[in-house]
Amino acid sequence: QPMTLEFCLRMHLRGTPDALDMATITLDKMAGGGMYDQVGGGFHRYSTDERWHVPHFEKMLYDNALLVRLYVHAWQVTRFERYRRVATETCEYLLRELRHAEGAFFSSQDADSEGVEGRFFVWPWDELVDIAGEAVATAFGATPDGNWEGTNVLWRPLPLEAVAAETDLDPEELAGELETARAELFEI
C-alpha cells in the first residue's frame, strides 16, 4: 500500500523518528523481492508470501504508477540511489511494455505466459547459470532445484556484499556482473 509508506515518509519529515525505518525497510524488501521484476523492472501486483519472494505475476499500470511516485519520494527524502534506480527502471518498464504505439497505456500485463502463470518471469537453474554464471544466479536467490515450483523466481534475498563474500568476488565486480546479466536475461 503505497499511501501508507508515503505517510511514513511524511511523518519522518515531521520528526517521527521510527517512520523512516518503517518505510525504508518495506521499500527495500519490495525492491529486493520477487514482487519487483529483477530483470525487466516494474512491480508485480503483490507478494503471495511473507518473505516478499513469490509474486502474483500480473503487473498493473496503477500499482506501478503509485510505486514510481513512492520511490521518487523516498529518493527525495533519503537520497538513496537504489530508490532512484527502482523508480527509473519502473518508468522504463511502463514506457516499454504498457504504452501503446499511439500513446495510450494498457492497464495491465497478464500473469500468464504461454498458458502458465509467471512462465516469462521464472528461470531454470541451468539456463540462468549458462547465461549469467553461478555468482549472479546466487545473487538472485536461485537454487539448482528451484526456489519455486522447480524453477526460480529471481529476487535479492541477501545484500550484495554477502553474496560477494560467498562467491569470492569484489562487490563492485559482482554489481557489474549483475547489470550485464540483467541485460542479457532481458534479451532472452
Question: Which ranges hold each PLM region?
Answer:
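Glycan-recognition and catalytic cores of secretory/periplasmic carbohydrate-active enzymes
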Residues: Q1-I188
